[in-house]
Amino acid sequence: MRVGSRLAVDVGKARIGLARSDPHGLIATPVETVPRDAAGSADVRRILEVAAEIDCTELVVGLPLALSGRATASTDDAEGFARRLADATEIRVRLVDERLSTVSAQGALRASGRGSRKQKPVIDQVAAVIILQHALETERAAGSPPGALVPRNRVDPDRHA
């Protein structure tokens, strides 16, 4: 298991949920919900601020695939957002399968007694926790990083993957 805090990113149309791991990759905890900025880059800037605050070594972006494994419009959106993050930072960015993370988050919140109206502010954070916890468990079991590394568009000879 690699050492270093990871920051999970659950990309939604209106909001982006963030969750972080401890440096040893044992547990994921919610951080905050960032408003989506479709017209600008305030969302990317905020995510990178949080990453710097926690001394993040990797960004884990959830990749929403259909149950069949096929790409959807949300898949394309998450991939585009992951590329924007990768182009804006030296931190590694990985795309990790997140099928059913939002459904699992809704179920967990409902089981904890939160109705659908009370879920809205935290649902994206809980989904990010589920994405990150799954990624951490997958890495522990497989012995290698989960998902796919997102390449950067600009060439930087000092960057190490």
Curated annotation (Swiss-Prot):
GO terms classed as biological process: rRNA 5'-end processing
Enzymatic class: hydrolase
SUPFAM superfamilies the UniProt entry points to: Ribonuclease H-like
Subcellular location: Cytoplasm
EC number: 3.1.-.-
Ranges where the record places region Disordered: 142-161
Keywords: Cytoplasm, Hydrolase, Nuclease, Ribosome biogenesis
Cellular component, GO annotation: cytosol
A GO molecular-function descriptor: nuclease activity
Classification via InterPro entries: RNaseH-like_sf, YqgF, YqgF/RNaseH-like_dom, YqgF/RNaseH-like_dom_sf
Stated family: Belongs to the YqgF nuclease family.
NCBIfam families: RNAse_H_YqgF
Biological role stated in the UniProt entry: Could be a nuclease involved in processing of the 5'-end of pre-16S rRNA.
HAMAP family the record matches: Nuclease_YqgF
Name of the molecule in the record: Putative pre-16S rRNA nuclease
